[in-house]
Every structure is written in C-alpha cells, then in structure tokens.
C-alpha cells in the first residue's frame, strides 16, 4: 500500500514482497524505519532505499489536485493497485477532504483495481490528475461519516460486542510520565516505591485526559431527510444540519455535485441554494464548513495537533481483530465514561449501511469459498489471497458475534419456534445459529449438554486446524463460538444444500456417520481430500461398522462428516474428533463420574508424540547404520587392501553427513478406538488392539513425560513462569496438556515442595475460577437479562465477600421481577456455604482434585476476581473492593457501596491491601443497606467471549522462519532482510493491530537490540507494548513482558529514568494479576537495581537487591547457588553504598554457599574468596573496584537472557533458545551494545569474567532461575 501518515508500514519497499523475496539473496542492508510514518510519506525515502534504483518498483509520482495545495508528491510501488494510491491520498492531511474522485493519467481514467505497473507509460515523476466525481447516495453517506470522524464530531459508537474502553492502551499516559521524569532533575520513579506494597487498581484505568478541541457543535441528518422523490430526480441525496462553534445552525443539501447551504428552516422546507448573503457551496463538506465557521480552521488544526501528540497506534481503528475488553473500567459515575448526547449516534446505522441495511448483507459462505479458490502460485497471489482471507475472517467473526449476542438475548426469531429452546435454530445476517447444547439428543450417550458444549468448542479448533492446512479442494464453513450470559452459541456460514430435503434412501451426509454412528456413508470423491487431511493431522485410515455390522473404510473419524454442497464443493463438518479419546482419563475412576465422554487429546500432544517417536526412529536408524558400518569395515579389513588414511576420513565424514531417510517412519492414530466400534473378524480385532495400544501409548506419553517435564522445567526455572489463569492455560495448551489435568499438575507441583508453591497457588486458583464459571453459567442460562448483574454480584459475594457479609442477599427489584413470572431466580438461594460445596464438587468431578479443608480462607481475592471476570466477560466499575470485615470503612455505608471514594486516611492503607484505589466519587446515599463486597452497580457490562477459526498467515510465517534459519547460519544480512519481509507481510495481511503482529514486533525489537540499533529496538518495543495492550489487555501477562523489554531497551539507549517508569508500571501490573513475589520478578528487581546503580542511586539499588534476595530465598532456599549469586551482587552493591561491613558479611555468605555447593576449586568459589579477602583487608580496594563494579554489573544485566526477554515473543513457558530465534541462549542474550567492551574486558586478562562464564555452564541445569545473575557473576 502507498505510504501515508495514516498507515503504519515500516518501509515502502516492503509493499512488494514478490520482488523483495526474489531479491533477498542479493539485496543490500535494509533497516526498519523506526520513525513515524509521516516521515516516509510524501516523497521521503526510508533509509537504504534509493528511488533511482527503483528497488522493488518504488518510485515517486505527483498528483495534481483541483484545490489547494494543487499538487502533492506520493511514493508508490509498481506492485500496488491504484486503489492503494487513492487510500494514500484520502489519508494525507492536505487531501483529507477528498473521498469521491477518480484518477486520470494522460487524459484517460485509471481503473482502481489494476496495478500501477499495468498503467501504460506511468513512470517516476509522472503526473496523475485527481478528478472529483459526482456523488451517489452511498458516496454521500460515506463522505458524511468520514467528515464527522475527521472533525471530531463522531461520539463513541455503542456496540454490543465491544464493551467499555475496548482496545484501551495506557502506554501514552505512562510514556508522558516517563518523559516528565526524564526532563526533571528530581527523584526517579522508584525512589519511594514499596516493593512489597499493595496493588492499586488505578494502574489499569485510563487516566483523565484533556478534552480535544471542538471544531463544530454537531453534524447530523436534518429532520427533512430523506429527499422526496421529485427532488431525488434533481440530484438531491441527503439533507444535513450543521451547528458551528459560533452557535449558528445551517441546513445543508447533499447534492450529486457537492454540498451547499439551503433555505430550509426547522419549520419550512426549501432545499434549494441560499444565495443571500452569498451562495455557499463546495464539493467537500469539510471545505463548506470552513467557509461557514470562522473558527473552524484554527480549531481543526488544534485538533490535528492534539491527535498528533498521541501515538498513532493508540487511536488506529481495528480492522482484522476484535479489541480487548478490559475487566475493570471507570465507574459509570466517573467523568471518563460520561454519556454525551449525540443525535447522529442513532443515525449512524443508516449512514453506514443504508435504509434497508442491504449493503451489509453478505453471502459469507460464497465469499469464504471463492477466497479459498483464489490462485496461490506466485508470492503476490499468496499475499493478496491471505490478506483477503484475514480481512474476511475478521469481518465474519465480528458480524457473527453480533448476531450471537442478539440470539442469546432472544431478539432473533427462531426458524423452528415449536421446538425446545435448546433445539431452536436461527438465521441472522446470512449466518446460521444454534445453541451449543444437546437439543436433539445427538450426544445423549456422550454426556448430553456438557458433551455438546465441549464438542462445539473442539469443532472450532478442528476447523481452525483444517483452515491452517489449506488443503486444495476441501472447504469448511465459516465457524465461530460465542459464550454470552451462560449460553454457548455456534454461528456458521450457510453451506449450500445443508437444509436440502433429500430423496428417500438418500443420506443427509455424503461421508462419515449419519445422525450418530448407526448409518455410515462413503463417497469416492471425498477419499482424496480426506486422505490429505488425515495425513496432515496424523489420523489413521481405519474401518468402522454400522449398526448392521457392515464395514466401511474411512479416512477420518466416523464423527467427521463430508457434505457435497449444491455448489459442487466438498465440505468437511463436525471436526470435534480429529484426535483420539484420552482413554486413560476415561478409564480412571474418579469419586464422581466425569461430566462427558468428549475428553479428547490435543493436537499439540499428537504432534509432540509424533516428534518423540520420530526421534526414536532416527536414533535406531543411526545405530543400525553404525552397526552395519562396523560390520562392513570388519569385512573390508579382512579382504580389501588398506585405504589411504585421508580417503578413509573423507568416507566417514560423508557417511556422518548422510541424512537419515524418514520415509520409512509413519505414525498415525485411530480416533475411533474405545468409542463403541465392534470389529468383526480376528484380523480386524488384532489391528484394532494395535491401534488402541498406540493411543494408550500417546496417553501415557502425556502423563509420564510431558506433564512431569513441564513441572520440572518450572521447578528448575528453565521456562518463563505463568502469571495468571490465561498464561497458565496457554502454557498447558502449548505443551499439549488439557485443562482437565490441572488437578494432576497441582498434585505433582505440591510434591515438589515450596519452590513450586507459586505454581500450586495458580493451579488451585484456576480450578476454583473455572468451577465458579461453570456454576455461574448454569445460573445465568435462564436468568432474565435485567437480573444478570444481580445474579453475578450475588454469586461473587458468596465466593469473595463472605467475610464482609456472611449471609449476602441478592439485590433484586421486586416490581421488575413480576414482569418475568417464568424467569429462573434460583441464584437467590445460593449461600456462601452452598457455593463452596458446589465449587468443591465441580473441582472434584472436573479436575479430580480435592481442595484443602478451608481453601476459601486462603483466596487471593483480587486475583481471583480478575480471573473470573475475564472468564465470564464481566466489566466491573472500579472502586475500592473490600473483601475483609477489618477493611470496612467505619462510617455507615450508603447504598451498599462500601464507601467508594471514602477518604479516611486511617483505613485507606488497610483497604488498599486487598483492592486498590479508585478515583470514582461516592454514589449518592439513598438508604442504608447491609455491607457487600460487590454491588449490582459494580457490574457495568458483560461482553461476549469469542472463539474463532481464523488461520494464521503461512506466507508471513515462512518468511519469518527463513529469516531465523539464515540468522542461525550467521547470514545476518539475509536473515534481517527476510525478517523485515515477514514484518511487512504481517502488517499487510493482519493489519497493524493484531496479536501476531505484536509478537513479531517483540522479536524484531530483540533482533535490533542485538545488532546495536537501539533506536529501532526501542521503537519496535514501544509498538509491541501498544498493540499488546489493545489486543490482549492492558494487564495481560504479555503486556508485562512487553513493558519489561521496553524498559531494558530504553536503559540501553541511555534513558534510564524512562526505563524505571516502565519497570514501575510492570511491577504494579504484576501486583494486580499475580500479587507480590512472582518467581520471574527476581530478574526484574535485579534489572531495577542495576539501573539505579547506573544513576548512582546506590542506597535505592541496594534495597532492590535485598528485595530480590528475599524472593530468591523463599523460592530456592538459603543454601542455593541462585541465592549465593544474589548475595554476591548484593555485597558489591553494599560496597558501592559504602557499607563495607555489610559487604563483607554478604560476600562471606556467598562464599560459604559456593564452597558448600560447588567445592573449593570452582571458579565461582575462588572469585568469591578473592572478593572476600579484598573487602576484608582494606577499604581502599572498595574504592578501587567501585567503577569496575558498576560497569560490570551493567554488562551482567545485559547478558541476562530472562531479563532481556528471552521470551521476546511473549509466551509464558518459552525457553531461552526458542525466543531468541537466532542463536542459542548464551549468544542471543549478549547485549550487542557492549560486545566490544566485553571483548576488551576479557582480553584485558581479568579472570573474574571468564571464571564465572564457565561456572554458568555447570550450574545452569540445576539453577537456571537466575541465569542472568549466574552469567553476570560468572
């Protein structure tokens, strides 16, 4: 796309991936442009790109305009389409007013959909002409919507899938605080920070902002709209009403020729031009308003200036992703979310989609399938196809989620109103909806509603896997699952022929089980495509038998169905059984029966098991060859003449390099074992038994290898530690572990002792939160909509607020209750005791784990509240939530609010311990009510939770993987080129705001950091923070890691005070989502300590080292090498703080531990001994070493893999080599900016550095939690 200030592409050359990839081998070094896009727009070249070289078809053209400034320059690429150039023009500040126009070259109109390379004679410095077009009604409506957004007259749209503050980013507010800190000479941001202090909920709330300059009072449709028939004949399209800042009201006619002021008043209709005092008209509404309002131009410039102060990413609209909805939002009474009057809000649907809404009705299924059939031969074809696919999935997911919410609320009429509620089906916006419940008894033998609910969730995962494989000739319907108010709703695009009445004797399904497993259909046309699918998913071709015992050979599970659509396409449906059942789980006796028989293995596990078996095969093959080689050598030595030594070495080398042929290896699992199939012959029974053994081996692999390895990795600190329920779930899923194993993992974690207390706490909390979710969903399913908040508040009080009120009563409006005589109000009967019993039962049944006797007394209330809110889609209004009677304010509580905004300095400290602060004012007192932790008014909103089947871009991932491989092979330039290409592809295909793009920003920022391009690293890390906040949440675990990365890069760039602000924010977030003393916070505290040393704040630095030591001792014990490493660092810090006595004491402790753990000859021990002697002998050596210490500590921190974000791609559970993406952990973790210093340091003959690096290798396996420290102390 053409470069504009409205688009965030890194360098113009990236717009032509076909050229770039083909030239990758010979291309020159390309650096990412970390500057704002405006600087690359309008004729400016990104570094490394020369226009005369026309690299990637890049050149500059001029555009002649009908109005000021009459001519602009635009950088374009020969690969992009004319419509991309149009978009560039629309986004440039000097050409904002144009929306309805076409482009001409040499007097001929250029088609919008051709590439620039196809325009005859168009070359560098050519001039194209912008010609204004007559408006149509649709163009006029779009123009009005666009102008309202530009001049800031558009208020917030009320949206049923985007909640309050959707897509919020706090980065700008934090950055402003950092900028103020950097500019001032005052104390740094950590000077009075309480490391073990309580969390403040203000951390995750938007900061109050200065209102933007107002350009007009309103732009709305006039009451005279729409135009009567006889005036439509004369070109009248719309009638508008504009009120300027001066208070004047103008009636405006939107005409095919443009906009003009008419003679209408509120009482008189005369839509013809007003000529007195003079005729006012313009092609653009923006130009017309500037003629009518004297203050408009200055206020519009002020608005643009104010918008330019913000990072463009924070205001960029979402295109290919659904924004994150924060769980905590400002209270409705606060000024931040005050509801403003805006008459046009109710008119926007008409402006966007016309009178009958027909413009937004799409044939989703046909769009999906025609997109899938697009050519994919060239790179350019693939870019276009994947870009379209990504946009289509995003549009469908949004439309389907909206419809699902309406279905859940009962606002869509069912197609079969006489059926039971769970069996009803709906069609809305060309999307077919049904409930994720067993309305027709399909899953009666599998567990009924529970099984159906799980099946539709697994179906989406299966469809996502098939979409990712992108098999030619196999089609899937667009599918989405939405959880909302206790209901699970499935939305699917309508497959042609799915509702068709078949002839007698014909099956509704063409391949697979028909209505269960009693009838099985086969069709020769499905065999080739299902064969490809099964091969990719490791599914074994196997026989199944129908109710008459007849054998049918199927490529997939009997549950997976093939349907030949009336459009001639082959569709695959019901993909919830693409992996086998977890046989061991089913057979394992729990105290209660598991709720369903849909407990299947994860695809990640099957892939992991396949790699494991292949590895065994390769080892066996290598061993077989070695034995054969030795036997052959023995024969040769007896018979043949002796070879020359060199020739023998060469032949051996050739044999070593020979690759093992894995074509003889195959592993495929039968998904239908243990599912009621009855083999008929002895041979079939034998084969079936073999299939069952393979599945059992896979289950055993999960239990005996995957789960123990994960627990051990977390115990040893080999991987990033999860912070909350979401990051824990991601970690388990990545390893192929199902959530039902939370209980087993908790038992294994407990057995490991105190070091994994943090993991045990997280696992138990996740089980409780999920049990509560199931219970709440059961209550919510039939609760009338106005009582949802009452139900949720009451259940939360029973779980979290029993100490404040042991017998909470649901707040229900009795007069409103009478309106719903058939509503289900059973939630009222819930008590703290009954809810605890229900949770214990759910945990026992679902996770086969017994909670401790008084588990409810050790809850982490705020963290559990957050987890539950995220799982149920609740948005809570912020205030001081009180969960303990001791923290209640002493004054009488009005309206059950518990003193929100209560300003008692004595109780404030106590209150903050549990909940945090709030800037919302106290609500007006109405009457005294019993104290409650959560009141109905706290439940501001409930948002739908969406599970989609959108595939990732294979092209962008291929470019990224090629870049990584090149870097691993030390082809730095090519690797950078390919990774930049991948970034361009990510941005083109996904759009800017997407979690996948955020991950890539992380990785790329790390790459630039390692290559000493610090500014680019900081810029990309900043983008990673904003995109992560907006797509994953302002307090997600990924956001914390993004801020920590950014802090390191800022520090490396010399902005240490800024870095400390980001660390402070990350620590504050940590307190909210996990609480204090997270295992990974040790490294962060060390970072902070080193940065403070850099600022010569030795006293504060020492406090952070001491805090790090406390956490380390609690996790690893007093006598661990990790603790010794921190003691060593702390002793140095004390020396810098002139505390020689303390320094000697800590260094002695470190020496004793090293001596005990590593022995007297280890270099760690020797170095500690040397330091100890020097510190003890005299204070002179302290002064002598002071400068060395500071410099060396800085190097240490930069060598810390974990600190530098070895998890640059922010996934908890990633190991160091994985995240580095280029080299092994020890290499990637080096701070490239100090590589030269390091070399000088080592060459200078200082033994301490060398000795410690060797120790690190010895100690890493057993104590990698502080690998950074070990390196540094190494």
Curated annotation (Swiss-Prot):
First and last residues of every TPR repeat: 293-326, 510-543, 628-661, 998-1031, 1040-1073, 1082-1115, 1124-1157
Segments traversing the membrane: none
PROSITE patterns given in the database record: CLU, TPR
Clu domain boundaries: 342-586
Region of interest (Disordered), ranges: 1-53, 631-655, 893-925, 1197-1274
Pfam families: CLU, CLU_N, eIF3_p135, TPR_10, TPR_12
Record's keyword terms, sorted: Cytoplasm, Repeat, TPR repeat
Regions of compositional bias (Polar residues) in chain numbering: 1200-1217
Subcellular location: Cytoplasm
One GO MF term attached to the UniProt entry: mRNA binding
Gene Ontology terms: cellular component: cytoplasm
GO biological process, alphabetically ordered: intracellular distribution of mitochondria; mitochondrion organization
Main function: mRNA-binding protein involved in proper cytoplasmic distribution of mitochondria.
Family: Belongs to the CLU family.
Oligomer status and interactors: May associate with the eukaryotic translation initiation factor 3 (eIF-3) complex.
Protein name, as recorded: Clustered mitochondria protein homolog
Lineage of origin: Eukaryota, Fungi, Dikarya, Ascomycota, Pezizomycotina
């Amino acid at each position: 796309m053409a470069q504009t200030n409205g688009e965030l592409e890194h360098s113009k050359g990236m717009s032509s991936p076909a050229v770039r990839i083909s030239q990758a081998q010979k291309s020159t070094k390309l650096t990412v442009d970390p500057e704002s896009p405006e600087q690359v727009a309008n004729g400016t070249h990104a570094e490394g790109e020369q226009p005369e070289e026309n690299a990637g078809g890049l050149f500059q053209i001029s555009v002649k305009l009908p109005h000021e400034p009459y001519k602009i320059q635009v950088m374009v690429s020969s690969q992009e389409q004319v419509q991309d150039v149009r978009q560039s023009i629309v986004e440039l500040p000097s050409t904002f007013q144009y929306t309805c126009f076409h482009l001409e070259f040499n007097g001929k109109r250029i088609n919008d959909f051709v590439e620039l390379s196809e325009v005859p004679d168009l070359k560098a410095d050519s001039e194209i002409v912008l010609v204004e077009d007559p408006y149509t009604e649709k163009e006029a409506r779009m123009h009005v919507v666009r102008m309202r957004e530009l001049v800031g007259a558009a208020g917030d749209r009320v949206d049923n899938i985007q909640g309050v503050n959707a897509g919020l980013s706090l980065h700008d507010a934090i950055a402003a605080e950092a900028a103020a800190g950097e500019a001032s000479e005052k104390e740094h941001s950590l000077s009075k920070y309480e490391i073990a202090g309580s969390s403040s909920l203000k951390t995750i709330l938007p900061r109050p902002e200065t209102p933007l300059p107002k350009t007009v009072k309103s732009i709305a449709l006039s009451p005279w709209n729409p135009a009567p028939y006889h005036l439509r004949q004369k070109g009248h399209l719309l009638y508008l009403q504009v009120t300027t800042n001066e208070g004047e009201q103008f009636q405006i006619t939107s005409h095919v020729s443009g906009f003009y002021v008419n003679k209408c008043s509120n009482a008189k209709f005369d839509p013809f031009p007003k000529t007195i005092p003079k005729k006012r008209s313009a092609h653009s509404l923006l130009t017309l308003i500037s003629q009518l309002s004297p203050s408009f131009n200055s206020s519009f410039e002020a608005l643009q200036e104010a918008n330019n102060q913000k990072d463009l990413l924070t205001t960029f609209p979402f295109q290919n992703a659904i924004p994150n909805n924060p769980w905590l939002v400002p209270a409705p009474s606060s000024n931040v979310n005050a509801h403003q009057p805006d008459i046009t809000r109710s008119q926007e649907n008409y402006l966007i989609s016309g009178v009958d809404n027909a413009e937004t009705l799409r044939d989703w299924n046909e769009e999906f399938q025609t997109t899938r059939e697009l050519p994919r031969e060239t790179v350019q074809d693939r870019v276009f196809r994947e870009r379209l696919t990504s946009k289509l999935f995003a549009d469908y997911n949004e439309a389907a989620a909206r419809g699902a919410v309406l279905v859940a609320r009962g606002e869509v009429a069912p197609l079969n109103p006489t059926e039971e509620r769970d069996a009803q089906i709906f069609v809305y916006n060309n999307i077919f909806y049904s409930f994720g419940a067993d309305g027709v008894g399909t899953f009666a033998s599998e567990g009924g509603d529970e099984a159906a609910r799980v099946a539709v969730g697994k179906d989406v995962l299966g469809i996502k896997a098939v979409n990712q494989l992108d098999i030619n000739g196999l089609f899937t319907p667009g599918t989405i699952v939405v959880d909302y108010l206790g209901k699970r709703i499935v939305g699917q695009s309508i497959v042609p022929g799915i509702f068709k009445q078949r002839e007698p004797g014909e099956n509704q399904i063409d391949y697979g089980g028909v209505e269960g497993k009693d009838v099985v259909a086969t069709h020769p046309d499905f065999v080739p495509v299902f064969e490809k699918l099964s091969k990719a998913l490791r599914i074994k071709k196997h026989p199944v038998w129908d109710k008459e015992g007849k054998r049918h050979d199927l490529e997939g599970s009997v549950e997976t169905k093939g349907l030949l659509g009336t459009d001639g396409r082959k569709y695959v449906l019901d993909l919830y059984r693409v992996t086998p059942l977890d046989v061991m789980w089913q057979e394992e006796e729990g105290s209660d029966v598991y709720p369903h028989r849909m407990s299947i293995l994860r695809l990640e596990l099957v892939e992991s098991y396949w790699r494991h078996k292949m590895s065994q095969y390769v080892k066996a093959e290598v061993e077989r060859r070695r034995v054969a080689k030795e036997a052959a050598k023995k024969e040769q030595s007896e018979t043949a003449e002796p070879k020359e030594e060199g020739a023998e070495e060469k032949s051996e080398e050739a044999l070593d390099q020979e690759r093992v042929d894995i074509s003889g290896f195959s592993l495929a699992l039968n998904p239908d074992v243990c599912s009621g199939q009855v083999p008929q012959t002895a041979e079939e029974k034998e084969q079936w038994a073999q299939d069952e053994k393979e599945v059992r081996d896979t289950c055993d692999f999960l239990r005996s290898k995957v789960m123990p390895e994960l627990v051990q990795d977390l115990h040893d600190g080999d991987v990033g530690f999860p912070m909350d329920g979401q990051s824990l779930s991601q970690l388990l899923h990545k390893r192929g572990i199902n959530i039902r194993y939370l209980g087993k993992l908790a038992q294994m974690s407990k057995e490991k002792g105190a070091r994994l207390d943090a993991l045990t706490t997280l696992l138990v909390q996740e089980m409780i939160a999920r049990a509560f979710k199931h219970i709440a969903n059961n209550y919510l399913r039939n609760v009338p909509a106005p009582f949802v908040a009452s139900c949720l508040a009451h259940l939360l009080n029973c779980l979290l607020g029993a100490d404040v009120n042991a017998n909470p009563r649901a707040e229900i409006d009795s007069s409103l209750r009478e309106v719903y005589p058939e509503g289900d109000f059973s939630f009222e009967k819930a008590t703290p005791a009954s809810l605890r019993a229900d949770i214990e039962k759910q945990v026992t049944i679902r996770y086969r784990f017994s909670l401790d006797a008084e588990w409810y007394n050790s809850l982490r209330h705020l963290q559990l509240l957050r987890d539950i809110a995220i799982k149920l889609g609740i948005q809570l209004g912020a205030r001081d939530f009180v969960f303990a009677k001791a923290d209640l304010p002493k004054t009488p509580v009005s309206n059950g609010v518990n003193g929100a905004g209560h300003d008692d300095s004595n109780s404030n400290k106590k209150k903050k311990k549990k909940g945090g602060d709030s800037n919302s004012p106290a609500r007006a007192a109405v009457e005294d009510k019993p104290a409650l932790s959560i009141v109905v008014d706290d439940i501001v909103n409930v948002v739908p939770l969406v599970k989609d089947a959108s595939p990732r871009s294979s092209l962008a991932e291929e470019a990224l993987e090629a870049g990584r491989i090149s870097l691993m092979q030390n082809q730095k330039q090519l690797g950078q080129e390919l990774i930049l290409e991948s970034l361009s592809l990510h941005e083109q295909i996904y759009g800017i705001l997407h979690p996948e793009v955020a991950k890539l920003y992380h990785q790329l920022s790390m790459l630039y950091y390692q290559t000493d391009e610090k500014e680019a690293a900081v810029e990309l890390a900043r983008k990673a923070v904003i995109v992560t906040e907006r797509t994953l949440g302002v307090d997600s675990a990924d956001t914390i890691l993004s801020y920590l990365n950014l802090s390191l890069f800022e520090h490396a760039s010399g902005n240490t005070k800024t870095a400390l602000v980001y660390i402070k924010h990350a620590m504050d977030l940590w307190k909210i989502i996990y609480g204090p003393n997270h295992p990974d916070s040790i490294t962060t505290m060390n970072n902070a300590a080193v940065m403070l040393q850099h600022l010569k704040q030795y006293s504060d630095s020492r406090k952070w080292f001491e805090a790090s030591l406390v956490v380390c001792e609690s996790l690893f014990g007093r006598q661990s090498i990790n603790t010794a490493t921190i003691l060593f660092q702390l002793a140095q810090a004390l020396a810098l703080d002139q505390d020689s006595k303390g320094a000697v004491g800590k260094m002695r402790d470190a020496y004793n531990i090293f001596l005990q753990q590593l022995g007297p000859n280890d270099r760690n021990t020797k170095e500690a001994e040397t330091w100890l002697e020097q510190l003890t002998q005299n204070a002179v050596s302290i002064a002598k070493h002071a400068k060395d210490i500071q410099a060396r500590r800085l190097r240490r921190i930069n060598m810390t893999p974990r600190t530098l974000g070895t998890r640059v791609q922010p996934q908890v559970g990633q190991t160091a080599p994985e995240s580095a993406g280029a080299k092994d952990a020890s290499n990637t973790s080096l701070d490239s900016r100090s590589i030269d210093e390091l070399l000088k340091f080592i060459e200078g003959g200082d033994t301490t550095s060398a000795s410690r690096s060797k120790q690190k290798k010895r100690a890493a396996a057993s104590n990698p939690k502080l690998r950074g420290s070990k390196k540094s102390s190494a």
